[in-house]
């Protein structure tokens, strides 16, 4: 038996420090099974087929010290019926054979995951640590190259840049697509997705205008240009952030119902009207709209059953107005609903209009009469507490000047 080689005495600390090349790792008793670094003879981190009666010496196992009072008497460790799998399986029933002065202790069954195994092996066996360091990493391109990254520009910024760099300050939709793909390689893939977003940005932003082709410029598709009143939407030529969102005031004021028609004629009429020179199409559409309104008014005048409300509906309207007036009066006079003779009701506190000036005195006397505490409480504080208990709001009995300002007549006559 080589139990003497594993004995950890306090005065032999220098010998142990020379034996271990790295600083010692201290763990607790509960985590003792996870702090055992197992040396293997043939494999990287596996402990296979050891006898249950054989004791493990310092040559076959690197032990981590336990910073409890058992270091002077620990002699060795023997494995129980457990085995440790390759990369961190469960260590079960690890029993330690201690000296006769201490009772044998069985380690708690636990599981060593891969991270714990790596940290323990690196802390106690420098052989495995160095072999782990010397491993070369596979040279893979984990990140896309910078030139193929997505540009930090919005679709409105891309369209504005494309139009502004054009000599004629006008581009077709296909030319905008081509300019974006030539400048940014990111947009050479997933073309259907971002081109759909470009079309939406052109249609739903007032800063872009659709210009029809002139006869001297034959071709396919209309031109897109920037609105002349949009100005500098981007601060100091920086296209990363828009300074303001342009809204066409004329388009917002007109509110044409056929604006969302979807055909090219309505888009042209809206863009031309936004420029200030309205096309004949827009004039005719506005004239038709006015004629339809006049026809509708005439039909309503001819049919009295549509204009004059029925007696039932008129009665319902009057009832709703009456309910609203009653609700407003109830909001102003919350004491109107309390018809019972309560000690703190308005009827008892102010029996006549001549006693308005005595309200504070009567309130104080009644509160002190009903409180029964005898403490020098103020009338307003006791009043609030008693009114809260009785179910009344304390705000229903404020100063008399409030009611005199709200009502033109005294309160007693108004109820």
UniProtKB/Swiss-Prot annotation:
One of its GO terms (cellular component) is nucleus. Residues 251-262 have a biased composition (Basic and acidic residues). Residues 310-323 have a biased composition (Polar residues). GO terms for biological process: anatomical structure morphogenesis; cell differentiation; regulation of transcription by RNA polymerase II. Residues 150-244 bind DNA. Signal peptide: none annotated. Residues 251-324 are annotated as: Disordered. SMART domains: FH. Transcription activator for a number of liver genes. Interacts with the cis-acting regulatory regions of these genes. This is Hepatocyte nuclear factor 3-beta.
């Amino acid at each position: 038996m080589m139990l003497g080689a594993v004995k950890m005495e306090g005065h032999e600390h220098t010998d142990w420090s020379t034996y271990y090349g790295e600083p010692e790792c201290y763990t607790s008793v509960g985590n003792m099974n996870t702090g055992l670094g197992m040396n293997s003879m043939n494999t990287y981190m596996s402990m296979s087929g050891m006898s249950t009666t054989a004791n493990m010496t310092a040559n076959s196992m690197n032990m981590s010290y336990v910073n409890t009072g058992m270091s002077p008497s620990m002699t060795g460790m023997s494995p129980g019926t457990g085995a440790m799998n390759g990369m961190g399986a469960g260590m079960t029933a690890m029993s330690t054979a201690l000296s006769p002065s201490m009772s044998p202790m069985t380690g708690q069954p636990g599981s060593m995951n891969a991270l714990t195994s790596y940290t323990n092996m690196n802390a106690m066996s420098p052989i495995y640590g160095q072999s782990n360091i010397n491993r070369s990493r596979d040279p893979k391109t984990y990140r896309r190259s910078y030139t193929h990254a997505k540009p930090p520009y919005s679709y409105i910024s891309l369209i504005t840049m494309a139009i502004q760099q054009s000599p004629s300050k006008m581009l077709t939709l296909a030319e905008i697509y081509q300019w974006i793909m030539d400048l940014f390689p990111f947009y050479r893939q997933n073309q259907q997705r971002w081109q759909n977003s470009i079309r939406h940005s052109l249609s739903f932003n007032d800063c872009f205008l659709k210009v029809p082709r002139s006869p001297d410029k034959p071709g396919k598709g209309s031109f897109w240009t920037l609105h002349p009143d949009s100005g500098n939407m981007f601060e100091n030529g920086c296209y990363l952030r828009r300074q303001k969102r342009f809204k066409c005031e004329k388009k917002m004021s007109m509110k044409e119902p056929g604006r969302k028609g979807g055909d090219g004629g309505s888009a042209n009429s809206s863009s031309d009207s936004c420029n200030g020179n309205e096309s004949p199409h827009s004039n005719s559409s506005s004239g038709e709209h006015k004629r339809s309104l006049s026809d509708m008014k005439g039909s309503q005048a001819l049919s009295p059953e549509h204009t004059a409300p029925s007696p039932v509906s008129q009665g319902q309207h009057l009832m709703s107005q009456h309910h609203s007036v009653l609700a407003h009066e109830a909001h102003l006079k919350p004491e109107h609903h309390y018809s019972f003779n309560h000690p703190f009701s308005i009827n008892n506190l102010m029996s006549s209009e001549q006693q308005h000036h005595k309200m504070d005195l009567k309130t104080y006397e009644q509160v002190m009469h009903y409180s029964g505490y005898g403490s020098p409480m103020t009338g307003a504080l006791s009043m609030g507490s008693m009114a809260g208990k009785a179910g009344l709001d304390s705000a229903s009995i404020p100063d008399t000047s409030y009611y005199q300002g709200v009502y033109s007549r005294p309160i007693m006559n108004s109820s």
